[in-house]
Amino acid sequence: MYTSQDSSDFFSPVSFTVISVCLLLLFAVLSLFAPSPDIENDFIRSRLDDSDQHQSAFHVPASGGAYRHDLWNSTNSKLFSACSNAGVNFAKADSKTHPDRYLLIATSGGLNQQRTGIIDAVVAAYILNATLVIPELDHTSFWKDSSNFSELFDADWFIRFLRNDIRVIKQLPNMGEKFVNPHTVRVPRKCTPKCYEGRVLPLLVKKRAVRLTKFDYRLSNMLDDDLQKLRCRVNYHALKFTDSIQEMGKLLVERMRMKSKHFIALHLRFEPDMLAFSGCYYGGGEKERKELGEIRKRWKSLHASNPDKVRRHGRCPLTPEEVGLMLRALGFGIDTHLYVASGEIYGGEETLEPLRALFPNFHSKETLATKEELAPFMSFSSRMAALDYIVCDDSDVFVTNNNGNMAKILAGRRRYFGHKPTIRPNGKKLNPLFMKKDNMTWEEFASKVRTFQVGFMGEPNELRPGSGEFHENPTSCICQKSGSEVKTGGFSSPQNQTHEVDNKVENRTEKQPAEEDREWSELDYDLDIRKQVELKGTKIDSLPILLGTDQAEVQVFFSD
């Protein structure tokens, strides 16, 4: 049995020396197989670099790259021309206008919604063989603009340009000793020519003067080519803004041109109402859900929202950041100048900041003009919208994150006047892509964006003739040069050939979209476009819904 003394003898100096020598030999042998400190540090550094590279794989470049031959022009635009002149068999106003029929209309909504009503009013007057009284504009809805027709448009030019098509007068004339009070009626939406002949014509014959109220989308989208061409003559030629609006609009364009040879105009809709209506979710947590949920309650006809489903269907408006990423992927670099036409942005400057970072050359009418220059227009929402309309129309590239009236009308106008590039986001493809972007490289993302946007860039023949709203796709008024062949990623069937004249009336039926496929501009808004005026000191936002479902008219709130 060992004693404490035995233990101390065991750990003698000689024993320690032997153990130390063995340990040194062991470390020496191990060092032959171990990597040097430099190699180990390099390995660790490499692992860290790989981790950083993975985290920063989605690195947005400042340069747009050279993905397209020419970002600022459409490929086949020279192969097409506008062709909206009346055909040889189109009856002229002098021979068909009945001397005792007067049509009056009251438009509805904002500038561009009212524009569609004015265009269709001319066609309705032609169908009814009636004299059109200069349209009455909407002064009571959300936009609260008191402008009359002649304060927005050149009334004399309007009357003069259309003199061969219909007779237009500025006011209802005195018809004998008794003052004629127009009979007021509202026609159904998408009313066909036969509908007008059946519903309105008997009233005109009996009452002599008929006033059609809330006149927006009250005429069928599908008409024979002669009537569609009349629509084009009104929209693209007869409706001219007043000199003061045109001069200010052109001044804004000139100031953009002074900053850059080319520029993009972006019509950005990201207001709280639009987002609430869409049923989309943008990552703002409970605060966003509560705020937008309260606004959404204003529409009685809307079902409970399913944000994931809405996004999968491509129904969510792109955020300002997503618009910026799309443009960069399409080839527009950080030096591109951007004119932004927008209303209130949900989230304010914080929401706009990513777009500004991508495109710091960020302009608006408020930054291009002085307060004094804008003063004559500031109190009139339609006149301010008209300024944006002019700049967007004259831009080299027009981009929109929505499919409202202004976007549709400008898309059609740009097709008519030379197929100027017009970028409409392919939401059904882009929305899922944006959700996955953090799991891919920028190169992969940009390549997919360019692929998905084929057919959404404003090239000729992207849309099938007759598809969509006519104001967006005026194929009856655009002719392809005889014998020319279009090579495009869109729909490639040739449009009207210039050597062919076909006024055949097609027996077409308009397809009514399912609710989930309807545009923001087509669903019921039970507060009659909210009418956000103050009634006896109380904002309409705080009022209960007043209209029953049997009274509610489809109002286009999200279109301008």
Regions from the PLM with identified roles:
Residues 1-560:
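N-terminal targeting/anchoring "stem" of glycan-biosynthesis enzymes
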